[in-house]
């Protein structure tokens, strides 16, 4: 039976993610902060919620920045929400925070003056929204284009390499909803809260060989 490590650095909706992975038959799911267990896992999930400064402080304190770089190179790796944002170069949250830098780009604030067709939009972006599939990727298998996923975020990803953008969202402006590079896949939305389509994505991740 394969092992899926859900990285625990004290910030994240870990049990919901783990339960969803178990529900789709992902194998032995371990919530862990043990570097040895993470290194030995067949797949790795990197969730996150909260302020990026606090997240990055814990990630660096535990040495998980280098660990994430290492384990995401040679096995299926999934970043979720702030776990996705932490993979970028830098976030402008909290006055500016350097991140892990696996995906080139910036994490930017939606702003207080966000409008769509004259309507003022509330920030954070919270609720269901469509994701346009920019390319065909194994994790989109059996998920229709423009399927709706559940989002909660005040900061969005402005990707520097558009070829890595595999899913796009729109909330007053266009943003990267999903990024991919080799065995790495990352989503801004919460698949564990996104019902049928979110569970399908997790099931696809559990079956994915990491190739793209």
Swiss-Prot record:
Pfam family, one: GATase
Main subcellular location: cytoplasm
SUPFAM superfamilies the UniProt entry points to: Class I glutamine amidotransferase-like
One of the GO biological process terms: L-histidine biosynthetic process
Annotated catalytic residues: 81, 190, 192
GO molecular function, one term: lyase activity
Family annotation (Gene3D superfamilies): 3.40.50.880
PROSITE patterns: GATASE_TYPE_1
Domain Glutamine amidotransferase type-1: 3-212
Subcellular location: Cytoplasm
Entry's Gene Ontology cellular component terms: cytoplasm
Enzyme Commission number, as recorded: 4.3.2.10, 3.5.1.2
InterPro entries: Class_I_gatase-like, GATASE, Imidazole-glycPsynth_HisH
Annotated catalysed reactions: 5-[(5-phospho-1-deoxy-D-ribulos-1-ylimino)methylamino]-1-(5-phospho-beta-D-ribosyl)imidazole-4-carboxamide + L-glutamine = D-erythro-1-(imidazol-4-yl)glycerol 3-phosphate + 5-amino-1-(5-phospho-beta-D-ribosyl)imidazole-4-carboxamide + L-glutamate + H(+); L-glutamine + H2O = L-glutamate + NH4(+)
Known pathway: Amino-acid biosynthesis; L-histidine biosynthesis; L-histidine from 5-phospho-alpha-D-ribose 1-diphosphate: step 5/9
Entry keyword set: Amino-acid biosynthesis, Cytoplasm, Glutamine amidotransferase, Histidine biosynthesis, Hydrolase, Lyase
Reported function: IGPS catalyzes the conversion of PRFAR and glutamine to IGP, AICAR and glutamate. The HisH subunit catalyzes the hydrolysis of glutamine to glutamate and ammonia as part of the synthesis of IGP and AICAR. The resulting ammonia molecule is channeled to the active site of HisF.
Complexes and interactors: Heterodimer of HisH and HisF.
Protein's name in the database: Imidazole glycerol phosphate synthase subunit HisH
């Amino acid at each position: 039976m394969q092992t899926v490590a859900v990285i625990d650095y004290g910030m994240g909706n870990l049990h919901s993610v783990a339960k969803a992975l178990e529900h789709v038959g992902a194998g032995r799911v371990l919530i862990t902060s043990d570097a040895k267990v993470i290194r030995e896992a067949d797949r790795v999930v990197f969730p996150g919620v909260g302020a990026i400064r606090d997240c990055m402080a814990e990630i660096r304190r535990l040495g998980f920045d280098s660990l994430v770089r290492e384990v995401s190179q040679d096995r299926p790796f999934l970043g979720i929400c702030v776990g996705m944002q932490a993979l970028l170069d830098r976030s402008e949250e909290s006055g500016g925070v350097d991140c892990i830098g696996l995906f080139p780009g910036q994490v930017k604030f939606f702003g207080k003056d966000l409008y769509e067709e004259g309507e003022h939009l509330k920030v954070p972006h919270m609720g269901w929204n469509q994701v346009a599939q920019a390319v065909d990727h194994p994790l989109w298998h059996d998920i229709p284009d423009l399927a709706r996923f559940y989002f909660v975020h005040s900061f969005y990803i402005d990707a520097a390499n558009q070829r890595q953008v595999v899913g796009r969202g729109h909330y007053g402006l266009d943003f990267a909803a999903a990024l991919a590079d080799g065995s790495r896949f990352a989503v801004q939305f919460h698949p564990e809260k996104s019902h049928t389509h979110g569970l399908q994505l997790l099931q696809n991740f559990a079956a994915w060989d990491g190739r793209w």
